Design a protein with these regions (language model features):
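Bacterial Sec-dependent N-terminal signal peptides
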Residues: 13-38
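Boundary/entry segment of secreted carbohydrate-active catalytic domains
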Residues: 35-75
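Glycoside hydrolase catalytic-domain groove-lining segments
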Residues: 70-73, 77, 232-242, 246-323
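Short acidic, glycine/proline-rich loop/turn micro-motifs
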Residues: 57-60, 131-133, 185-188, 280-283, ...
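Sec-dependent signal peptide recognition
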Residues: 2-10
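Substrate-binding cleft and catalytic face of glycoside hydrolase catalytic domains
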Residues: 74-196, 203-215, 219-238, 244
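Short, solvent-exposed loop/turn segments at secondary-structure boundaries
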Residues: 60-61, 95-99, 281-288
């Protein structure tokens, strides 16, 4: 198995022009003409360290470059990170309850104590949710669309109220994780929770409640329910819609078009970008993927009038022999 370092790079990109005051002075007019108009970029550097408590329970330890044992969150800050991303699963009891709301609180408290910003990443599933699967939580199965909107809203508020009661104010909240194909739609899985594919390599959809292609209005309705729930607890939180393949402009127009045309709101667009796997999956070089993503960031920021953030990325940290 490849050695992989997964790092979350929060890059909040503010596209704007520098303000200039008018002047009748020729000298000032000359200086104004010579002034360079630059893009203003504010970076949040962070990591998704949601696994840290599970790793600690198994005896894993973390060390800085000097060989000093250091708690993982503190180590992230030592190396210049100023934000932490934490995923939330609804009922991960089949997976030892890691990433349930209580486990998230433990990690969020560490970040707060270090003065780091927190992003809460709702998966709205009992385990992993991504473009290939968005499995409906077991306790929500069989519910109607309206009932499931309430389930989603109540879960969102319950988790965020727990944060609030403990003095933690997330700066960002993801309503869904890589909802490229919607949210709250299920696929056939094995006992471990991994998707089972057909002979053509496609996942087998068993419930299409919030599938973006099959039920676009319901996908938008779920997102809107999550947005409103976040704002009820934290009115100033930045709500993110998170999609994968940040270089794919057609994908972003299609998915975000579903949301906006159905009245759903978002404050920020979050992107996943894995440039060093793009060649095998998408036939693009890493540079092509990165350049395409940067162009798409500028485009969607202007089109939808909001900031854009790379919320998920990853890269190899070692070669096949394990050499760093």
């Amino acid at each position: 198995m490849k050695n992989i370092l997964e790092v979350l790079v929060f890059a909040s990109v503010l596209w704007g022009l520098t303000a200039c005051s008018s002047s009748s002075s020729k000298e000032e007019e000359f200086e104004k003409e010579e002034e360079k108009v630059e893009e203003v970029v504010e970076f949040y550097k962070g990591a998704d360290i949601s696994w840290v408590t599970e790793m600690e329970s198994k005896g894993h330890k973390f060390y800085n470059a000097a060989g000093k044992e250091t708690e993982c969150t503190a180590l992230m800050k030592e190396y210049g990170m100023n934000a932490i991303r934490l995923r939330v699963w609804v009922d991960p009891s089949k997976h030892d309850n890691w990433c349930n709301k209580e486990d998230v609180l433990v990690k969020a408290k560490r970040a707060k104590a270090l003065g780091m910003e927190v992003m809460i990443d709702f998966h709205y599933s009992d385990w992993w949710a991504d473009p290939a699967k968005q499995n409906i939580p077991a306790s929500w199965k069989g519910h109607s669309y309206e009932e499931m909107k309430k389930d989603l809203a109540n879960h969102t508020k319950e988790v965020l109220q727990l944060m609030k009661s403990n003095g933690i104010t997330p700066k960002w909240v993801q309503v869904g994780n890589e909802t490229t194909n919607g949210m709250l739609w299920s696929v056939k899985t094995n006992e471990q929770g991994w998707e089972i594919k057909d002979e053509n390599g496609n996942t087998i959809i068993t419930e299409s409640m919030g599938h973006a292609t099959r039920n676009p209005e319901q996908y938008a309705g779920f997102f809107a329910a999550g947005y409103d729930a976040v704002k009820e607890i934290f009115p100033d939180a930045i709500v993110i819609v998170h999609l994968d393949n940040g270089f794919d402009s057609d994908l972003y127009d299609w998915n975000l078009g579903i949301l906006t045309s159905n009245g759903a709101k978002f404050d920020m667009i979050g992107m996943s970008l894995y440039p060093y796997w793009a060649e095998s999956y998408h036939g693009k070089t890493a540079d092509q993927t990165i350049n395409g993503c940067m162009a798409n960031i500028k485009r969607v920021s202007a089109k939808y009038g909001c900031e854009v953030m790379i919320v998920e990325t990853g890269m190899l940290c070692a070669d096949e022999q394990g050499k760093l």
